Swiss-Prot record:
InterPro entries associated with the record: Ribosomal_uL3, Ribosomal_uL3_bac/org-type, Transl_B-barrel_sf
Family: Belongs to the universal ribosomal protein uL3 family.
Known function: One of the primary rRNA binding proteins, it binds directly near the 3'-end of the 23S rRNA, where it nucleates assembly of the 50S subunit.
Organism: Oleidesulfovibrio alaskensis (strain ATCC BAA-1058 / DSM 17464 / G20)
Biological process terms in GO annotation: translation
GO function terms (MF aspect): rRNA binding; structural constituent of ribosome
HAMAP family from the UniProt entry: Ribosomal_uL3_B
Gene Ontology CC: cytosolic large ribosomal subunit
Keyword vocabulary terms for this entry: Ribonucleoprotein, Ribosomal protein, RNA-binding, rRNA-binding
Subunit description: Part of the 50S ribosomal subunit. Forms a cluster with proteins L14 and L19.
Pfam family membership, one: Ribosomal_L3
UniProt superkingdom: Bacteria
Protein known as: Large ribosomal subunit protein uL3
């Protein structure tokens, strides 16, 4: 799906800043970029418009030969993370250009994609907010169980997407309409209003909306 331009970064953590009226605003600090353009794709040649960007320089011993050859064409060094961003229109950037936090302005709204914090194997009460079984009156060892998961003759199966216990978290999550409160270009920092997915130091993608 076509998107608008974005930049990779790391979630530093949360803090608060004070607005002009004295109110406290909770913000997430993201250290983003600079992200050099490694490859540019266009609809005529590749079937779609996109740019591939790199983030966080890597040592040569940590990059395999195919990736090394691919990144050498851009002449910007080797990177730990490569991400492709599909675009609606042909990219204005060229191979070797840097994408920085200057891409964004305070007040605009962005969407942030990250990997949610992994919680491991979780039961239905924690994972899906089930109410559980009664605490007493004849109920024994079923207090946190899900209850019935299906019927007998019909449908004779468990329905697809039935909410059950399982691995919780560690999934790609996108939060939309986050307002940029401040951009600190000298430190490559973006301050967005509210929380973003993932743990501290987690990889995130910040995109225009």
């Amino acid at each position: 799906m076509a998107e608008k331009m974005g930049i990779l970064g790391r979630k530093i953590g949360m803090t608060r800043i004070f607005a002009n009226d004295g109110s406290a605003v909770a913000v997430t600090v993201i250290q983003a970029g600079p992200c050099p353009v490694i490859q540019v794709k266009d609809a005529a040649k590749d079937g779609y418009n996109a740019v591939q960007i790199g983030f966080e320089e890597a040592k040569e011993k940590h990059v395999n030969k195919p990736a090394r050859g691919h990144m050498d064409k851009a002449g910007r060094g080797l990177f730990r993370v490569l991400r492709e961003i599909r675009l609606e229109a042909p990219a204005e950037q060229k191979v070797g250009d840097d994408l920085t936090v200057g891409l964004f302005t305070p007040g605009e709204f962005v969407k942030v994609t990250g990997t949610s914090i992994g919680k491991g194997f979780a039961g239905v009460m924690k994972r899906w907010n089930f109410g559980g079984m009664p605490a007493s009156h004849g109920h024994e060892a079923v207090h946190r169980s899900p209850g019935s998961i299906g019927h007998a003759t019909f449908p004779g199966k468990v329905w697809k997407n039935k909410k059950m216990a399982g691995h919780m978290g560690a999934r790609q999550v996108t939060v939309k309409s986050l307002q940029i409160i401040e951009v600190r270009a000298e430190d490559n920092l973006i301050l967005v209003k509210g929380p973003v997915p993932g743990p501290k130091n987690g990889l995130v993608m910040v995109r225009k909306q």
